[in-house]
């Protein structure tokens, strides 16, 4: 089934029930259906095992962060002392298939576009989401962004990966603090209350190397 042809809406793509009724199904013989189910069950087991592996790697990063930085007496700064904050200017439907540059929106999926507005190292924080499930992406180079995507530049020569991790660790809290009804969103007032630990730069680099190594294990 190719349901994407029925998508409507820019901020929250959706499909009407009447469109589902237009789709047809291929009905295989019963024995063939059983074979397919057996294969799918094996796939589900592999996926579940892989999810457990990824969760364990995430726990390893968190444990390393606590070991290196928790209750060490390092300075703690608020959002506006850490980030230069701006946003993109485009609508989310400005993407182009096979475009030349990454286009960051509030979707977890990375889109493409043929023009760029930024050429830098940055963290990209989704500013709205239907369920308040935000994410943080890292990128260095030329890119563009949706008008509700926060583009974050560090004010000092700090590790982007360290602050990406600290932001990701706060996403559940941000979900709880979200405003809005059908579509949840974040404001600068909410973000401005967040605090970040600022360890020495050599320890930031050490943590970044560790995270990079663990991340490589995730894609093996």
Where are each of the predicted segments found?
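Compositionally biased, intrinsically disordered low-complexity regions enriched
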Residues: 85, 91-95, 118, 169-170, ...
């Amino acid at each position: 089934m190719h349901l994407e042809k029925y998508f409507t809406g820019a901020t929250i793509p959706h499909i009407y029930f009447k469109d589902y009724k237009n789709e047809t199904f291929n009905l295989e013989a019963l024995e063939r259906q059983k074979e397919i189910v057996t294969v799918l069950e094996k796939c589900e087991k592999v996926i579940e095992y892989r999810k457990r592996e990824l969760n364990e790697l995430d726990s390893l990063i968190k444990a390393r962060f606590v070991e290196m930085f928790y209750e060490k007496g390092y300075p703690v700064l608020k959002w506006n002392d850490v980030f230069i904050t701006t946003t993109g200017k485009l609508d989310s439907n400005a993407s182009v298939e096979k475009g030349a540059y990454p286009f960051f929106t509030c979707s977890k999926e990375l889109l493409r576009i043929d023009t760029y507005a930024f050429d830098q190292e940055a963290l990209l924080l989704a500013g709205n989401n239907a369920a308040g499930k935000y994410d943080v992406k890292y990128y260095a180079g030329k890119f563009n962004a949706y008008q509700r995507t926060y583009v974050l530049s560090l004010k000092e020569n700090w590790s982007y990966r360290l602050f990406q991790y600290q932001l990701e660790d706060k996403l559940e809290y941000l979900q709880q603090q979200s405003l809005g009804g059908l579509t949840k969103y974040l404001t600068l007032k909410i973000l401005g209350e967040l605090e970040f630990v600022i360890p020495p730069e050599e320890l930031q680099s050490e943590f970044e190397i560790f995270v990079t190594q663990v991340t490589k294990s995730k894609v093996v």
